[in-house]
From Swiss-Prot:
It comes from Streptomyces hygroscopicus. GO terms for molecular function: methyltransferase activity. One of its GO terms (biological process) is antibiotic biosynthetic process. Coiled coil: none annotated. Transmembrane segments: none annotated. CDD domains: AdoMet_MTases. This is Phenylpyruvate C(3)-methyltransferase. The keyword DNA-binding does not apply. It comes from the Bacteria. Its EC number is 2.1.1.281.
Length: 337
């Protein structure tokens, strides 16, 4: 197969790569600022009016929409922006772009400094925990929730106390509290910014007396001072952070610590994206490359689905069911007991 392209084709392709980089960041910004929701509801918006209503710098707002227009997400018709041919798909995946740019942008920006081995000591990279929590709330809702609720509906019992590891914004615990009146929730997160955000969310939605949070690392759960609360938990959940348990020996130890720390858990719902195998470079779906490359940069091992299957029994758990998620790379919710 010929790979030759004309000079004009190469020039256009490289310009598209450059513009797509800006558009990628603009998707996350347009979501956070409310533009994508307004376009979804109305099909169009007036740029000047939008800037005034949200107290935004109008020339920069024009630039944001120009970036989106350069890749077909919107079209600019004078002072009006209308949805483009790729709007629905981009809007559906908007939280993934926010995770990549607003949450992990600093990691990728410093790629030349992060890659050299001599620099990979101590805290050698930085991400925005608050932005990641903001994005992960919708990532969880759009991609993991159908599989999660299918697992919850099949529990065979009504949970009384739920603990969520890597609880982020606290949204999962809020949803569970809505589903099961009277249930108590406990979030465990390592990031102070995420806990502060979650506490505000929980209080604002009226669950401050049911849901609480503790700062802690799931990998060293035995060092978290919440033994009494942990002993009451009968449903344990963990989403989008199970890969932090790895490599294998560490994962087995973490699973054993969790089994000991939560002695009365009847089900452990563990959901995560896994490392893909065998996908050609030019056919990688959305999110996969950013997720895998980003974690490689951070030195975080990403297991394959088969590798996950090989640790549960040794870690003190039995996998009773797997709920596949086809819309987000190779992702899954494991039902463990």
């Amino acid at each position: 197969m010929s790979t030759e392209v004309s000079e004009a084709q190469a020039r256009r392709a490289v310009a598209d790569i450059f513009n797509s980089t800006l558009a990628s960041s603009a998707i996350g910004a347009a979501w956070e600022l409310g533009a994508l929701d307004e376009l979804r509801e109305n099909g169009k918006l007036d740029v000047s009016d939008f800037a005034v209503r949200h107290d935004l710098h109008e020339p920069a707002v024009v630039g944001m929409f120009t970036a989106l227009a350069s890749v077909g997400i919107v079209r600019r018709e004078g002072a009006t922006v209308v949805v483009g041919p790729y709007f629905d798909e981009a809007n559906h995946h908007r939280s993934l772009f926010h995770w990549l740019n607003q949450g992990s942008g600093e990691l990728f920006r410093r790629m030349p400094q992060v890659l050299p081995n001599e620099n990979r000591t101590g805290k050698f990279y930085q991400r925005d925990a608050g932005a990641i929590s903001y994005a992960c709330r919708e990532i969880s809702e759009r991609y993991f929730d159908p599989a999660f609720w299918a697992a919850v509906d099949g529990l065979g019992y009504t949970p009384t106390t739920v603990a969520d590891l890597g609880s982020g914004s606290g949204e999962r615990l809020i949803q569970i509290a809505r589903r099961f009146p009277g249930v108590r929730g406990l979030g465990v997160d390592i990031a102070d910014g995420a806990i502060a955000m979650a506490e505000k969310e929980v209080a604002a939605k009226g669950f401050g007396d049911q849901i609480s949070f503790v700062r802690g690392d799931a990998r060293t759960i035995d060092q978290v001072s919440a033994r009494g609360e942990f002993a009451e938990v009968d449903l344990l959940t963990c989403f989008m952070m199970g890969h932090d348990f790895w490599p294998r020996e560490n994962c087995v130890q973490t699973l054993r610590k969790l089994r000991a720390a939560f002695p009365n858990v009847r089900r452990f719902l563990l959901g995560d994206a896994t490392r893909t195998v065998g996908i050609p470079d030019r056919e990688l779906p959305v999110f996969t490359l950013g997720f895998e490359f980003g974690h490689d940069m951070m030195g975080v091992y990403l297991p394959t689905l088969d590798e996950w299957d090989g640790v549960f029994e040794e870690g003190g758990w039995r996998c009773v069911k797997k709920h596949a998620i086809d819309s987000l790379s190779v992702s899954v919710v494991f039902e463990l007991e």
